[in-house]
Amino acid sequence: MKIPIYMDYHATTPVDRRVLEAMLPYFAEDFGNAASKSHAFGWRAEEAVEAAREEVARLVGASAKEIVWTSGATESDNLAVKGAAQFYQSKGKHLVTCKTEHKAVLDSMHALERQGFEVTFLDVEKDGRLDPARLRAALREDTILVSIMHANNETGVVHPIEEIGRITRAAGVLFHCDAVQSAGKLPFDVEDANVDLASLSAHKMYGPKGVGALYVRRKPRVRLIAQMDGGGHERGFRSGTLNVPGIVGFGKAAELARLEGAAEAERVLALRERLRKGLDAGLDLLTVNGSLAHRVPGNLNVSFAYVEGEALMMAIKDVAVSSGSACTSASLEPSYVLRAMGISEDLAHSSIRFGLGRFTTEEEVDHVVRLVVEKVRKLREMSPLYEMVKEGVDLSQIEWANPH
């Protein structure tokens, strides 16, 4: 077993060796620009790019012409949300999203608010899922876009996107879905979900960093305002020379996910349950954050009451985990996702996100269980609050001298 152990698969995944092998020729031998139409170097690059486009499209049930290459999911989210809102603003300026979305969507929405759009930020249920009835009630005559993710990046909780898609389609409202954490791990089909726009990322499915895609529906055609000016690449949606090796890697990663994803999900789910049951057997006052029934297979987001998440992360420093999203973990604020689920600030501060994936082993899971149980017990020994609770004191009845 190699130390350190990687259990942060929602932040990024290692590039699969088969993906790397597919990419290598496009760095030095077949190095052409896919937009160079006048010679064989360009033709070979373009051929590879189009083959990858087919693979990514097949993974999500789309046609290749509906896949637009980007630099990653953040760009895909920005292009979808801002591009659609700006194009369709003559029909209305009301947008709907959810309080637990990724920052790339939330901050795009805030940027649009500054441009005069009105945004409704929906609450989620205690289990982290969006109740479709809340969405239905929020739609108005001037609503033009709904943006709801498929699976949450912190809790792994899966929203009922098929039902959401039926509601938006019936209302004639565009539906953008951030499918970054689900594509390749769960079945995700743009037709089944009535999705009009979907964000995808290579590095969340064992592909390279710095390459993403945006699915843009053609029937009925969805229009966007480009967010970057330039040579009009990608049918005018996204200018810029294509990252050919990265795109080839994305294509291979998508192919592997399509062929092996179901079997892999089963294996990873068994490992996740082994981790959960092991922690549960060794510790009390342990809370799983978010629905277990509706969740990506490799996610376990747990709060260890009376233990600071940051302190536990330092105590298990040879295990790579996170306390929240990698995009916001520089902040010491408790996770906004957990707070939106109604989880107390103290419990949110004590949360750890374990992300398991393709290269996680049983041996690693068992080692992590032993280590976490040992360190949580040790940290709780230093907690007077934990001691009081064990002695039967109801902390909610205590009047503190200096309430924090």
Swiss-Prot record:
Any one GO cellular component localisation term in the record: L-cysteine desulfurase complex
Cofactor: pyridoxal 5'-phosphate
Catalysed reaction equations from the record: (sulfur carrier)-H + L-cysteine = (sulfur carrier)-SH + L-alanine
Binding residue positions for pyridoxal 5'-phosphate: A73, T74, N153, Q181, S201, A202, H203, T241
Enzyme active site: C327 (cysteine persulfide intermediate)
GO biological process, one term: [2Fe-2S] cluster assembly
The keyword Cytoplasm belongs to this UniProt entry's keyword annotation: yes
A Pfam family per the record: Aminotran_5
Residue positions, PTM N6-(pyridoxal phosphate)lysine: K204
GO molecular function: 2 iron, 2 sulfur cluster binding; cysteine desulfurase activity; metal ion binding; pyridoxal phosphate binding
Matching InterPro entries: Aminotrans_V_dom, Aminotrans_V_PyrdxlP_BS, Cys_deSase_IscS, Cysteine_dSase, PyrdxlP-dep_Trfase, PyrdxlP-dep_Trfase_major, PyrdxlP-dep_Trfase_small
Enzyme Commission no: 2.8.1.7
Pathway: Cofactor biosynthesis; iron-sulfur cluster biosynthesis
EC class of the enzyme, as a word: transferase
Compartments in which it is found: Cytoplasm
Keywords, comma-separated and alphabetical: 2Fe-2S, Cytoplasm, Iron, Iron-sulfur, Metal-binding, Pyridoxal phosphate, Transferase
Binding positions ([2Fe-2S] cluster): C327
Functional description taken from the UniProt entry: Master enzyme that delivers sulfur to a number of partners involved in Fe-S cluster assembly, tRNA modification or cofactor biosynthesis. Catalyzes the removal of elemental sulfur atoms from cysteine to produce alanine. Functions as a sulfur delivery protein for Fe-S cluster synthesis onto IscU, an Fe-S scaffold assembly protein, as well as other S acceptor proteins.
Family: Belongs to the class-V pyridoxal-phosphate-dependent aminotransferase family. NifS/IscS subfamily.
HAMAP family assigned: Cys_desulf_IscS
PANTHER family, alphabetized: CYSTEINE DESULFURASE, CYSTEINE DESULFURYLASE FAMILY MEMBER
Annotated NCBIfam families: IscS, PRK02948.1, PRK14012.1
Protein name per UniProt: Cysteine desulfurase IscS
Species per Swiss-Prot/TrEMBL record: Anaeromyxobacter sp. (strain Fw109-5)
Encoding gene, per UniProt annotation: iscS
